[in-house]
């Protein structure tokens, strides 16, 4: 937040001391927990003072060195003047929430053994076209995505907290989105991670999977939207894009994308009003925000742990 000179103004694309300062802080957090951590800086225009992308990548060794998997969130925020709301300086919802979730997951994973080598990542340049995750996945470096290992799955955290179980000022629940993929054939389930996604929400967390509102939610870009436009728990297999999971889905990984209310369901999207104070206000208090943040974080944590132990969750091209 803006308190205590917080790590705000994390815009990417020009020399930005605020972004560099934040990246160094995040790197120190992962290193302090014992992770092998790197800052991945990529330039493609000959000017090293203006990196095309700057990511923080923490690695955890797995039992099987023939495969790799990961979780991530973008740490950059919408630049000034950006659509649709004019850009932001704090980016509390998009995507400081996801950034902090990765810092907390890193704490939890310290004592957990994983099957495959695992990366926990904070991406840059998501708001400029997924350039950060693409730089990691499509370049050759010692701490980039290995090309000689099977990429099994990836879970993406974006825009967290303004979603079920939080309630809108109008009295209806905020929408909760979690999409798995790839969704190759819209008529059938294509990947096993979809079963993991459904099991976590339906059976473990006891989410109201069939709850619907009167009317419709204000935004929908997935190919199943006509079936789900009034569904609170929009949890299913789909082709939805717009964030870094696409980078890994395109490489055959099974993916899950967590997203809260967006576009017209959250008026502060990509605007100067995207602050922690505003998030607390629109969900009805700090306790309500904590509940909604904890719900999606437990979901993602459980998804990761179950997918890690599910051999059928593997690259669709394997």
Predicted regions and their residues:
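A non-catalytic alpha/beta surface segment that caps or lines the substrate-entry region
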Residues: 2-61
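Solvent-exposed, acidic/flexible segments
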Residues: 12-23, 51, 68, 91-99, ...
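His/Asp/Glu-rich mid-to-C-terminal helical/loop segments that flank catalytic regions of hydrolases
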Residues: 259-317
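Structural recognition of the beta-strand scaffold that forms the well-ordered cores
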Residues: 26, 37-41, 55-59, 68-73, ...
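Alpha-helical metal-binding/catalytic segments enriched in His/Glu/Asp
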Residues: 58, 71, 76-77, 81-130, ...
């Amino acid at each position: 937040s803006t308190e205590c000179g917080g790590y705000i103004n994390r815009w990417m694309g020009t020399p930005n001391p605020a972004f560099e300062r934040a990246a160094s802080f995040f790197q120190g957090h992962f290193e302090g927990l014992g992770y092998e951590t790197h800052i991945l800086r990529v330039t493609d225009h000959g000017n090293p003072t203006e990196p095309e992308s700057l990511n923080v990548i923490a690695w955890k060794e797995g039992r099987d060195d023939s495969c790799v998997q990961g979780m991530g969130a973008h740490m950059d925020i919408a630049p000034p003047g950006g659509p649709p709301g004019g850009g932001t300086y704090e980016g509390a919802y998009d995507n400081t929430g996801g950034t902090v979730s990765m810092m907390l997951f890193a704490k939890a994973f310290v004592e957990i053994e994983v099957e495959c080598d695992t990366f926990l990542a904070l991406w840059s340049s998501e708001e400029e076209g997924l350039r950060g995750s693409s730089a990691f996945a499509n370049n050759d470096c010692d701490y980039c995505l290995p090309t000689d290992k099977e990429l099994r799955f990836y879970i993406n955290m974006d825009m967290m907290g303004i979603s079920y179980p939080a309630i809108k000022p109008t009295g209806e629940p905020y929408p909760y989105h979690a999409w798995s993929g790839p969704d190759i054939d819209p008529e059938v389930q294509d990947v096993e991670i979809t079963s993991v996604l459904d099991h976590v929400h339906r059976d473990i967390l006891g989410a109201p999977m069939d709850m619907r509102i009167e009317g419709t939610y204000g935004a929908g870009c997935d190919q199943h939207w006509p079936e789900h436009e009034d569904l609170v728990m929009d949890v299913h297999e789909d082709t939805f894009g717009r964030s870094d999971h696409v980078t890994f889905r395109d490489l055959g990984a099974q993916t899950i994308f967590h997203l809260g209310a967006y576009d017209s369901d959250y008026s502060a999207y990509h605007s100067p009003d995207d602050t922690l104070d505003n998030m607390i206000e629109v969900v009805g208090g700090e306790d309500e925000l904590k509940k909604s943040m904890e719900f999606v974080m437990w979901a993602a944590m459980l998804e990761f742990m179950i997918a890690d132990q599910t051999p059928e969750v593997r690259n669709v091209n394997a």
